[in-house]
Amino acid sequence: MEALVYTFLLVSTLGIIFFAIFFRDPPRISTKK
């Protein structure tokens, strides 16, 4: 059961980091359209 908790923490942390980077400059992919 500990592995599940650690996995969840890792995924949540990665998600937060990804969202932070994505919201910093989001119009990078959209501007190329």
Swiss-Prot record:
It is a single-pass membrane protein. GO terms for cellular component: chloroplast thylakoid membrane; photosystem II reaction center. Pfam families: PsbT. It comes from the Eukaryota. Its main location: plastid. The keyword GTP-binding does not apply. It is found in: Plastid, Chloroplast thylakoid membrane. The keyword Transcription does not apply. One of its GO terms (biological process) is photosynthesis. Found at the monomer-monomer interface of the photosystem II (PS II) dimer, plays a role in assembly and dimerization of PSII. PSII is a light-driven water plastoquinone oxidoreductase, using light energy to abstract electrons from H(2)O, generating a proton gradient subsequently used for ATP formation. PSII is composed of 1 copy each of membrane proteins PsbA, PsbB, PsbC, PsbD, PsbE, PsbF, PsbH, PsbI, PsbJ, PsbK, PsbL, PsbM, PsbT, PsbY, PsbZ, Psb30/Ycf12, at least 3 peripheral proteins of the oxygen-evolving complex and a large number of cofactors. It forms dimeric complexes. This is Photosystem II reaction center protein T. It comes from Piper cenocladum.
